[in-house]
Each structure stands twice: as structure tokens, then as C-alpha cells.
Amino acid sequence: MQNLLEALVPRSLVHDQTPGLQARLAQGPITGYVGFDPTADSLHVGHLLAVMSLAWLQRCGGTPIIVVGGGTGMVGDPSGKRSERPVLSVEEIDRNVAAIRAQLERFVSFEGQNAARVRNNADWLRSIGLMEFLRDVGKHFTVNYMLAKDSVKGRMESGISFTEFSYQLIQAYDFWHLFHAERCELQMGGSDQWGNITAGAELVSRKDGASVHGLTFPLLTTASGTKFGKTEGGAVWLDPARTSPYKFFQFWLNTDDRDVERLLKFFTFLSLDEIAALLAEQARDPGKRPAQRRLAEDVTARVHGPDVTRSVIEASRILFGGTDLRAAGVDVLDVLAGEIPSATVTGDELAALTVADLLVKVGLAASKGEVRRGVAGRGFSLNGAVLESGDAKVAAGELLAGGYALLQKGKRNYALVKVR
């Protein structure tokens, strides 16, 4: 079985590592952790490198620990932040912790010999007193050492509260606690976490004379220079209530050709040979974008499940051609209804309305006059068939699965009517 570095380095997933990590991994599997700040009730794609590092750790025989920062979340990590985060209530944090754990279950197994574990650092941070903390942790760090950390230096001009200044000591205590309680010898995180990670290794070394290790992965930007995971609509979330599975799929499908090889290495478990084969296929026929399609299918299936992914793919085919509308199931049309303009009518209303009325109702036409002109130019369709007259009505037998009717204007403008 390959060790963690042997798995991650060829995929360019390692930015930095502490001395001696390779030698330690050569001795056998290791227990490692990643911390997640529970400032929201969902992870987003910007967290996925951390999640994948835990998944690879488990695949390499190690034991992953997910530390949800219920305690540190009440303080706030200054790393990479221009201003202080709002402090969350205990109830908000507990609710977010439960939601994040559920999402992580799609990436790591919580069963078996090296089952993943979830820990909330509030469980040990809430019980430690200030005097005890200063005695057992604070005395091992000089202020000069703490000021030298990039996470602090970047905030000196704008101002940093003592609360955030002390964050690195609290995270260091997390590492020390996990080393003692669970024999955890590795902390992983983004490259902006290097200072916090090394502070933890320093604390273990000074208090116990033991060696523990750190590993960081790169902060990811796209070829266009933008921060990965950000769109015009904001962050791309794993929670389907925040980012629909359809939009999630489209995010990956729209990956720039210059980024797709790297993202396949980062966010899938495909072998390097499989990735090379996809890229070779793409070079032969770039228009089909097989690499982006495989990336989108793989990540969406892992986050939302294979059934939802199949529905999303079928919904995409409806909008971009290549599928039989009559074969589309209710689940597929339900996906579409969440992504394109939609309206609901009763059976009696359907019997009274013409197709022109429906086109106006869903916003595909401003008036019946526009419908007449569009029909003359063969510019409207109903359920994939060119509309011959705006005065026609939709018969119950013409409805698609689930009582849907799909209206189309031109090549790219769609709307759904659902009969209830």
C-alpha cells in the first residue's frame, strides 16, 4: 500500500511538509487531522482539498480525524482574513457541526479498522481554565514568535484583537490534545495554515519532547487568476439548498481547459493513467470536453449521489439537446423546474389557456403579438415540437411525466409549466 506522500505528491497536492514526515510514514500508517471552522451549516468547494486529503489518508491506511472547531469557531482564525469574523452562538455552532459531519460521510468511512472520527474541540477547550491555559500553553511561546506568523503580520496595520491573536495557541493546544488523547501525529491544512500547524508541532515538542508532523496543500486559484470556488453568484456550496446539484454540476463542467488536468488530480480518485487517457481523448476531440464531463460527473456523484447526478445529466441534455423528452422522468423535470422559469396551473386553467397565454405567463413572450410573430418564424416549440399556432391548447395527453409541459423560445430559452 502506498503511503500518504506517495499518493499526494504525484498529484501536486503537497505544498509544504515538516522534516521527517516521509520517514515517519515509512514506518506505517499515521493518524492525522484537519480542522474545519463551523461558520456555516455547509462546506463549499473551497474546503474540498482538505476533505480529499482526509480521504487519501484513509485510503493509505491512516486514520482521519475531523476536528470541527466548535471552540475555535467562537474565536475566529485570522489567517487570510482582513477583518474579524462574527462570533457564533453555541447553538449555531452545534447545528453547523452536525450538518458538516453529514457532508463528510460521502468522502470518508466512519466504519472499519481505521474509521474516521469527528471531534469538536469545544469538548476540551470549554473545560480548560485561563490560568491553566497560560501555564500549560502560553509559557511555551514568546510574543516575538507569535508576531512572526504570517497570519498575524498581515493584520497588524488593520488591527487584530487579542482573541484572534491567541488563535494560534488554541489551535496548537488542539494538536497537543489530539496527540495525547488519540496518538494523532499529523495535522493537514491549506498553505495559509502553516504557521498554526507548526505552532502545534512546537508545543508537542516543548511539552513532550516528541515529534509530530504537518502537511499543507496549495491554495488553489484558476488559470484566469480568480480564487477557486467563487462564481458571480458567490461560493459553490455542497448543500443542495444553497447550490443546486444542477448548478454544482455546471460549475465543474465549465472548468477551463487549462485547469481541468489539475482539478482531476485534486478532486477525483482517478488514477494518473486514467487522467492521462481522458486528456488524450480531449486533445483528439476538444469540443466534446470528456475531461470536464468526467470531472463534473465524478465530483457531483460523490457530493450528491449517483441518482441525483443522473437526473442532473439528463436535465442538461434536455437544455442542450440530445435526449428524448418523452423518456424524461419526473426527477429530471423536477431538476429542470428549479433551474429555468416555471409556472404552475390547475387542470381547469390549462383547459382555458392557449399556448400563447402560457408563453406570456412564463415570460418567454411579452405579448400574444410576439407569440404570433415568433410562430410565423418557427421560433417557439412545445415539448420539442415546433409550435404551429399560438391559439392551440395543451391537451392532458401531451403532458410530460409529472404533468409538465416544456416551452422553448429559440435555441436556449426554456420554461416549464406544471399542471397540479
Curated annotation (Swiss-Prot):
Signal peptide: none annotated. It comes from the Bacteria. GO terms for molecular function: ATP binding; RNA binding; tyrosine-tRNA ligase activity. It is found in: Cytoplasm. Residues 353-419 form the S4 RNA-binding domain. The keyword Protein biosynthesis applies. Keywords: Aminoacyl-tRNA synthetase, ATP-binding, Cytoplasm, Ligase, Nucleotide-binding, Protein biosynthesis, RNA-binding. One of its GO terms (biological process) is tyrosyl-tRNA aminoacylation. Homodimer. HAMAP family: Tyr_tRNA_synth_type1 (MF_02006). This is Tyrosine--tRNA ligase.
